[in-house]
C-alpha cells in the first residue's frame, strides 16, 4: 500500500511541493510497519534511501567514546526522539525518554540520501513504538525529479537548510568541546 499525497506533504522536506507532485512521490513509496527496537539506520553505514515516518516515534543516537577503568569503549548515547502528531503513535514507547522529544505531523530521516550516492549515515535510528513508515530511494526520487524538475528545487532547498542547521550545530559543539578540552588541560 502506498501513502497518500497528503501524508507525503506532512513531511517537512516535501511541505513546499504541490499535492500533485507529492502524489508522484507517494506512488514509489510502500508503507511498511515495524515493532519497537527495530533499527532503521546504522551510524557509519552508507545508503541511498530516506525513511519517511508516518506514525510512531524513533530515537536518534550516536556512538561516543567513553573512558573506563580498562581504557576506552564505545557507548551509544541518545541524542533526540522524533514523534509523529498526525497521527500520534499507536501506543506509548517501551522505554521512557531521557532526551528531548521533537513532535511533527510526520518526518523524514536520512534526507542526505536524496542528494548523495552512498550518503554516510550520521546516527543510529531505532523505533521506540510501533512504526508506520516508507522508504524513498534515490533512484526513484531522481527519476521523478528528471520528469518533474519543479520538485527538485523545493526538496533540495529543504535538504540544504537541514545541512546548514546540522553544520551550525556541529560547529557550536566543536567550539564547546575545544573550550572544555583547553579548560581541562589548564587544571
Regions inferred by a protein language model and the residue ranges of each:
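Cyclic-nucleotide recognition modules
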Residues: 7-10, 75-156
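Polybasic "coupling" helices that flank or enter modular domains
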Residues: 126-128, 150-187
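Short phosphate-coordinating micro-motif centered on Lys-Gly-acidic
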Residues: 40-45
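Cytochrome P450 core scaffold surrounding the K-helix E-X-X-R motif
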Residues: 61-70
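Short beta-strand segments in beta-sandwich/barrel cores
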Residues: 30, 39, 57-62, 87, ...
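Cyclic nucleotide-binding regulatory module and flanking cytosolic helices
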Residues: 1-36
Amino acid at each position: 500500500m502506498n501513502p497518500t499525497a497528503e501524508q507525503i506533504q506532512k513531511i517537512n522536506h516535501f511541505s513546499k511541493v504541490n499535492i500533485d507532485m507529492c502524489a508522484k512521490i507517494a506512488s514509489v513509496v510502500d508503507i511498511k510497519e515495524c515493532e519497537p527496537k527495530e533499527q532503521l539506520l546504522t551510524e557509519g553505514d552508507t545508503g541511498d534511501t530516506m525513511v519517511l515516518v508516518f506514525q510512531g516515534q524513533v530515537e536518534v543516537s550516536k556512538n561516543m567514546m567513553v573512558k573506563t577503568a580498562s581504557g576506552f569503549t564505545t557507548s551509544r548515547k541518545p541524542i533526540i526522539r522524533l514523534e509523529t502528531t498526525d497521527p500520534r503513535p499507536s501506543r506509548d514507547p517501551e522505554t521512557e525518554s531521557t532526551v528531548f522529544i521533537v513532535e511533527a505531523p510526520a518526518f523524514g530521516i536520512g534526507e542526505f540520501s536524496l542528494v548523495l550516492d552512498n550518503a554516510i549515515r550520521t546516527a543510529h535510528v531505532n523505533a521506540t513504538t510501533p512504526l508506520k513508515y516508507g522508504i524513498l530511494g534515490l533512484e526513484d526520487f531522481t527519476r521523478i525529479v528528471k520528469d518533474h524538475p519543479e520538485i527538485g528545487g523545493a526538496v533540495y532547498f529543504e535538504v540544504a537548510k537541514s545541512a546548514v542547521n546540522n553544520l551550525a550545530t556541529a560547529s557550536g559543539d566543536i567550539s564547546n568541546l575545544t573550550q572544555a578540552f583547553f579548560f581541562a588541560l589548564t587544571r
